[in-house]
Amino acid sequence: MSELTALTIAEARDKLKAKAITATELTDAYLSAIDAANDAINAYVAVTHDQARSMAKASDERIAKGEAGALEGIPLGVKDLFATKGVHTQACSHILDGFKPEYESTVTANLWADGAVMLGKLNMDEFAMGSSNETSYYGPVKNPWRAKGSNADLVPGGSSGGSAAAVAAHLCAGATATDTGGSIRQPAAFTGTVGIKPTYGRVSRWGTVAFASSLDQAGPIARDVRDAAILMKSTASLDLKDTTSVDLPVPDYEAALGRSVKGMKIGIPREYRVDGMPGEIEELWQKGIQYLKDAGAEIVDISLPHTKYALPAYYIVAPAEASSNLARYDGVRYGLRVPGKDIADMYEQTRAAGFGKEVKRRIMIGTYVLSAGYYDAYYLRAQKVRTLIKKDFEDVFAKGVDAILTPATPSAAFGLADEVLANDPVKMYLNDIFTVTVNMAGLPGIAVPAGLNGQGLPLGLQLIGRPFEEETLFQAAHVIEQAAGRFTPAKWW
């Protein structure tokens, strides 16, 4: 059965088309793999055995009739942030206990319309707030990778840690994820998978639990660049239910793979050389530059002067929006309810019991920066900085730069329950140092594995593109992937 779960989406698609395998066989292989591994990895918070089998059966019937969709019979995992009709959707928070929506998110509806099969809901940081998948009410996810000669558990990154771990451990063919400040790209880099955060507005946010509405964007995590391109094509669409959704044709992203990057101008931002960055990250970056240079790309030095303000500005804007978005969870209509002596007390008791520590921290920060005395000093200033960050990118792209190459993360995956990071949230927030600028500017960014560190752990590079030019990112990322190879963890679970 493991040979079936080893197939990429592209390989499985071809075998299903040729009737060499059935969707039912493929789905059963994944369900068996999940049942055997999930206690160890904790990637899934709900496994939809019956639904998966009935969807696979329907796929087999459509294939037999010659009516196969673009993702017909491909088994996928869904981050617990996406509404799935009648199925556990709790954003991995205690406050949404037992919530099963009556509607389907646009992203998942698009995937099911193309014939994909749902295996279940994937673990994540609570309300997508975290960089290590340790804030989930359902416990942490373990990275399928381990350092050479060590049995120590590592984090898979966050907030889409369940998505990245499930893809890396072959517990789904691909997964949906979301990215508010790096939540697709950082876990992808930590697990040796490919993750793309599309341009803001390219993929509908309707039916996705909101964290920071002006920053959130859904995208796929997959095993390789081709699979990410295939999933992206099915995910992206115009959606009138999302006012920020953009009416642009969805290109065939897969067709961009294999196109030459000869003459493409790749920018290298000097501000991304941060103090204390490990030598192996700098080495990897140089390797990536060489891969693109060898393929004919032109490498140019660029400056993004406001980069150093991105992280502090992000940790004002995102919590401010979160404090507003999370005000709706009060125990009245759905989810957890803790009784109180009156309605105000019930609200307080429910929110105190329902939200985890990190979520409470961000609600408090957000409420503080939006309060009358501090709005101008913090929130308004952060929004002005955001405009300057966006202008930095616009200036660079106006000079003819096609894409920007940076490291995806400042390190490889770190240990689970790291005491230093647990006691210093700012150190944890620094994990997003290379990724937040992309969300602040609404641009597309892709993380692609480019090598292993000295301990045998995966490291990723990030490519940042012009708005709505995801094709360029797939094109350049494919060049890096072809040169660097693909990376799979040794099985310990």
UniProtKB/Swiss-Prot annotation:
Keyword annotations from UniProtKB, A to Z: ATP-binding, Ligase, Nucleotide-binding, Protein biosynthesis
EC number in record: 6.3.5.7
Keyword Transmembrane helix assigned: no
Catalytic activity, as annotated: L-glutamyl-tRNA(Gln) + L-glutamine + ATP + H2O = L-glutaminyl-tRNA(Gln) + L-glutamate + ADP + phosphate + H(+)
Enzyme class: ligase
GO cellular component, one term: glutamyl-tRNA(Gln) amidotransferase complex
Keyword Ligase attached: yes
Gene Ontology biological process terms, A to Z: translation
InterPro entries cross-referenced by the UniProt entry: Amidase, Amidase_CS, Amidase_dom, AS_sf, GatA
GO molecular function: ATP binding; glutaminyl-tRNA synthase (glutamine-hydrolyzing) activity
Active-site residue numbers: 79, 159, 183
Pfam families (alphabetical): Amidase
Subunit field text: Heterotrimer of A, B and C subunits.
HAMAP family referenced in this protein's UniProt entry, alphabetically: GatA
NCBIfam families (UniProt xref): gatA (TIGR00132)
Family: Belongs to the amidase family. GatA subfamily.
Function according to Swiss-Prot or TrEMBL: Allows the formation of correctly charged Gln-tRNA(Gln) through the transamidation of misacylated Glu-tRNA(Gln) in organisms which lack glutaminyl-tRNA synthetase. The reaction takes place in the presence of glutamine and ATP through an activated gamma-phospho-Glu-tRNA(Gln).
Protein name: Glutamyl-tRNA(Gln) amidotransferase subunit A
Gene encoding the protein: gatA
